[in-house]
Swiss-Prot record:
GO terms for biological process: translation. It comes from Leptothrix cholodnii (strain ATCC 51168 / LMG 8142 / SP-6) (Leptothrix discophora (strain SP-6)). Part of the ribosomal stalk of the 50S ribosomal subunit. Interacts with L10 and the large rRNA to form the base of the stalk. L10 forms an elongated spine to which L12 dimers bind in a sequential fashion forming a multimeric L10(L12)X complex. Keywords: Methylation, Ribonucleoprotein, Ribosomal protein, RNA-binding, rRNA-binding. One or more lysine residues are methylated. Belongs to the universal ribosomal protein uL11 family. The lineage of its organism: Bacteria, Pseudomonadati, Pseudomonadota, Betaproteobacteria, Burkholderiales. InterPro entries: Ribosomal_uL11, Ribosomal_uL11_bac-typ, Ribosomal_uL11_C, Ribosomal_uL11_C_sf, Ribosomal_uL11_CS, Ribosomal_uL11_N, Ribosomal_uL11_N_sf. One of its GO terms (cellular component) is cytosolic large ribosomal subunit. This is Large ribosomal subunit protein uL11.
Amino acid sequence: MAKKIVGFIKLQVPAGKANPSPPIGPALGQRGLNIMEFCKAFNAQTQGIEPGLKLPVVITAYADKSFTFILKSPPASVLLKKAAKIDKGSPRPHLEKVAKLTRAQLEEIAKIKVKDLTAANMDAAVRTIAGSARSMGINVEGV
């Protein structure tokens, strides 16, 4: 018989830097889950990823106080800012452009994000990422 699911917890945790402090501790503590067990498992699983890169994680909490978690790819905005070498997007994206990205750069980001997007193919994924870039005030070439 399958375990009874108590709930889902969605967090953004820096890769390799999970610790019991907020937001992880309180979120897991409310469900009675072992915080240190999650931190050790998360840090072990994110060992090969750039330290400090925020990763979305979905934790499934079960009635017997056990859990499983699924790592997602980093948010598109984080990857776009990294590729464009900027700290933040434009406060007025359609009036002020802060950077330029080429189609090749967007394809690299789309390859990372494609498993988390609902895009039917790679071209659709690139267009989705291009839309995110435009909404941040980044000029997109070749799309």
